[in-house]
């Protein structure tokens, strides 16, 4: 389990920190070009597949919280990655996950709390560029405070399947309503 955690943390850190460094090394070895030079040909999609922003499939409710799957599936075994967008004034309720998850804040400010009690004044700002570990089986909740100028956008990576459990004010799992 420790190996998996360290591997996943390495993936998040390498993505956040290492990729820009490698890009600088690659650029230093190639011919110099500026943004005023003509662009090169599009990359071969069998080498570097890309998805344009307008083609990203978002789920959820715009203006509240949205998610876009990057790879994998959090409900199935294996590595998964999602982008989460928290709009200002929206939060989850206190809960925990049965698997560790790793977050990198891309933009905005992500507000988090480890309190069992929902009180937005207990949230703490996690700013763009920060890496956070969502420890398994520990209560937290998150979102974006009212008054933020932009949504909090983060990449979340974990191992599936992951189960999310809502908790009461004592940190105990809430009863799951019976299936209809």
Show where each model-derived region lies:
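C-terminal segment of classical bacterial N-terminal signal peptides
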Residues: 15-25
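Positively charged n-region of N-terminal signal peptides that target proteins for export
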Residues: 1-6
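Conserved short histidine dyad/triad with adjacent acidic residue
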Residues: 80-97, 135-137
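Short beta-strand His + acidic residue motifs that chelate non-heme Fe in jelly-roll/DSBH
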Residues: 92-94, 112-113, 134, 139-147
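Double-stranded beta-helix
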Residues: 47-49, 133, 141-180
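A short, N-terminal "cap"/entry segment at the start of jelly-roll beta-barrel domains
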Residues: 29-80, 169-180
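Glycine- and acidic-residue-biased ligand/ion/polar-headgroup-sensing regions
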Residues: 87-90, 97-117
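Short acidic-glycine-tyrosine-enriched beta hairpin
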Residues: 116-138
């Amino acid at each position: 389990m420790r190996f998996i955690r360290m591997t996943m943390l390495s993936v998040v850190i390498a993505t956040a920190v290492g990729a820009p460094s490698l890009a600088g090394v690659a650029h230093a070895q190639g011919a110099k070009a500026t943004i005023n030079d003509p662009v090169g040909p599009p990359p071969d999609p069998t080498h570097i597949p890309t998805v344009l922003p307008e083609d990203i499939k978002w789920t959820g409710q715009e203006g509240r919280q949205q998610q876009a799957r990057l790879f994998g599936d959090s409900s199935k075994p294996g590595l998964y990655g999602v982008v989460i967008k928290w709009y200002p004034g929206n939060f989850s309720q206190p809960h925990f996950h049965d698997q560790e998850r790793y977050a990198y804040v891309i933009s905005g400010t992500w507000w988090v709390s480890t309190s069992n009690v929902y009180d937005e004044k207990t949230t703490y700002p996690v700013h763009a560029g920060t890496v956070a570990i969502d420890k398994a089986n520990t209560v937290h909740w998150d979102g974006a405070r009212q008054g933020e100028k932009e949504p909090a956008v983060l990449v979340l990576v974990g191992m599936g399947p992951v189960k999310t459990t809502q908790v009461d004010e004592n940190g105990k799992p809430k009863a799951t309503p019976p299936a209809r």
